[in-house]
């Protein structure tokens, strides 16, 4: 078989992106990886199946990629990821255009699937539904060499009533401590300066392997690696955040004063029905404890509106929390009724129009909160990692901003700027979510 050109489309979360990077890095054949699907002989779509809108986007993307079989060079279309893990057999019947289907842990079967198709004309499902391994190995980084996601565990042991992820990704499995450190060391040698730790629950790291939580130890060891300047923590469960973790964030200059702590709601009634392990008082106490120890910390959270049984009172309580808590970065999801979850069977399902209105109301409140917080930053100087140039402004992020989901810092400069470098920016103007500034002491001697 001649050398094939291989294209990949990655949908969904940053954990899916890591899977895609491992897929690209693990292929045994000498493929040529291309960015333009018009050039590809083989196109793989790494799907998301978390909520209904993500499932629909995945199917639409698969059908869109099939057009390249009709009009261009593509001869084989492959689907993998959460959607295929959840609906592999049904997907084969629903979308016959797919030539091979792989589950979330089946990337090692990719070469076989391609060989079978081109040599034997075979179309098949390559899903090992009992595989509880962790996708690890060489990666081809797609986020720019200066910033890389590092997954520290796979799966989830929480049983939130709205979430299908444990059934797709399996039980919680921590990666070996040494493997993670080796990966970060290799990333650093290849130019990575910012490491973003991800998992379904980063704060539980180590419990299954070592009998104790070791996230704070992981941070300490990573910070010793030369070249790593920022370490950012995502997906922290409030009840799993330890004193040791807070102390490490406060004392370790390489660990960003940033924590992503999805709480989903603040009403005890809704939290109970979500099967969440924390209640309002515990969440408020945790936020206060973190801020007391790390005064300038940026807190990100995510919320779900329109959960079954969410009354006007529950929603107003959530609105009051958003107004008062001064959360730096916030995302809102409309509840999605997912088959196979406990919440899907609950009474008092909320109409889509109500969900949409509640999402809009929360984001309007947060927009003003964010604008007020940003106004206090005028005149301050921040270390910013440079991400690019949009034709008018250079842009990047300070420690308060995770890539893609938070705001940006925009600035102009008459000097030569290198993407991936750090630069000091003095803030001169604030927007709702973004900041505008100038290079600090650009022309000073």
UniProtKB/Swiss-Prot annotation:
Chain positions recorded as [4Fe-4S] cluster 1 binding sites: 13, 48, 82
Matching InterPro entries: Elp3/MiaA/NifB-like_rSAM, Methylthiotransferase, Methylthiotransferase_CS, Methylthiotransferase_N, Methylthiotransferase_N_sf, NA-bd_OB-fold, Ribosomal_uS12_MeSTrfase_RimO, rSAM
Residue stretches making up the Radical SAM core domain: 142-372
Key words, A-Z: 4Fe-4S, Cytoplasm, Iron, Iron-sulfur, Metal-binding, S-adenosyl-L-methionine, Transferase
Main location: cytoplasm
Family annotation (PANTHER family): RIBOSOMAL PROTEIN S12 METHYLTHIOTRANSFERASE RIMO (PTHR43837), RIBOSOMAL PROTEIN US12 METHYLTHIOTRANSFERASE RIMO (PTHR43837:SF1)
HAMAP family the UniProt entry points to: MTTase_RimO
Function according to Swiss-Prot or TrEMBL: Catalyzes the methylthiolation of an aspartic acid residue of ribosomal protein uS12.
UniProt name for this protein: Ribosomal protein uS12 methylthiotransferase RimO
